[in-house]
Amino acid sequence: MIQVLLVTICLAVFPYQGSSIILESGNVNDYEVVYPRKITPLPKGAVQPKNPCCDAATCKLTPGSQCAEGLCCDQCKFIKAGKICRRARGDNPDYRCTGQSGDCPRKHFYA
């Protein structure tokens, strides 16, 4: 589950890599999107935003990093448990970081 999440994050943060190619099947394979019939190189000079928490070449967290993004992630580390990451709205309580994830807990719906 975490590896899938990291791949999703890295693909979102690093959508274009100089060595990547777009092929015609839609499958992600190593550092390219695969389409079987046609190969189209990505444009040169495509924006490559830097995220110090995520290694774009491997799509994994950099050494010492616990997270790459999220309301409970600060400088590649989980924020301490108890910090408010989403203020109360209506009948919902404040949402607080768990200290074990970079994501703010999901909203709970009460009947």
Swiss-Prot record:
Keywords: Cell adhesion impairing toxin, Disulfide bond, Hemostasis impairing toxin, Platelet aggregation inhibiting toxin, Secreted, Signal, Toxin
GO cellular component: extracellular region; plasma membrane
Domain of life of the organism encoding this protein: Eukaryota
Tissue expr: Expressed by the venom gland.
Maturation propeptide residues: 21-44, 110-111
Residues annotated as domain Disintegrin: 45-111
SMART domains in the cross-refs: DISIN (SM00050)
Signal peptide: 1-20
Keyword Disulfide bond belongs to the record: yes
Subcellular compartments: Secreted
Disulfide bond annotation, renumbered to this chain: 53-76, 67-73, 72-97, 85-104
A molecular function GO annotation: toxin activity
Position of sequence motif Cell attachment site: 89-91
Annotated SUPFAM superfamilies: Blood coagulation inhibitor (disintegrin)
Role summary: Inhibits fibrinogen interaction with platelets. Acts by binding to alpha-IIb/beta-3 (ITGA2B/ITGB3) on the platelet surface and inhibits both ADP-induced platelet aggregation and platelet aggregate dissociation in human platelet-rich plasma.
Annotated family: Belongs to the disintegrin family. Dimeric disintegrin subfamily.
Assembly behavior: Heterodimer with piscivostatin-beta; disulfide-linked.
Protein name: Disintegrin piscivostatin-alpha
Source organism (scientific name): Agkistrodon piscivorus piscivorus
